[in-house]
């Protein structure tokens, strides 16, 4: 009988330790701003999570966090390239509710264009090709950069 009591006490101690470890791990992820920053592109009702490449917190502008390589092509390779038709409308959903969004398009020939946005929406080009889009958002959290790529057919 005494042995069973010792086993129960050990189980309680182990369970308590595991609970503390799990709560500590969960608390850390809740305080990590990078884990909370999300940007989605919505195409024909489907949502796709963009790649967060850079983050500069508002409260510490000296701190610059780069999650990936500085090569935009390598970052775009992490996104599942979308195939869309010419003129398709894309809508952005950024969970940090930014006050401004700047969209830059990288063309196949290496040139870049600033893309006009209206109501967090852009229209795909009227020319077929491969394009990488970079969204720079500024909001209460700071500045974030998101990447996604498309093939326009």
Outline where the language-model segments fall.
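Positively charged n-region of N-terminal signal peptides that target proteins for export
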Residues: 1-13
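Mature extracytoplasmic domains of secretory-pathway proteins
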Residues: 55-110
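Conserved structural position at the C-terminal beta-strand
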Residues: 135-137
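Surface-exposed, short loops/turns at beta-strand junctions within beta-sandwich domains
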Residues: 122-131
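C-terminal motif of bacterial Sec signal peptides marking the signal peptidase cleavage site
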Residues: 22-25
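Bacterial signal peptide processing site
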Residues: 27-29
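Short beta-strand segments within Ig-like beta-sandwich modules, predominantly Fibronectin type-III
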Residues: 111-118
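Edge beta-strands of extracellular beta-sandwich domains
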Residues: 143-153
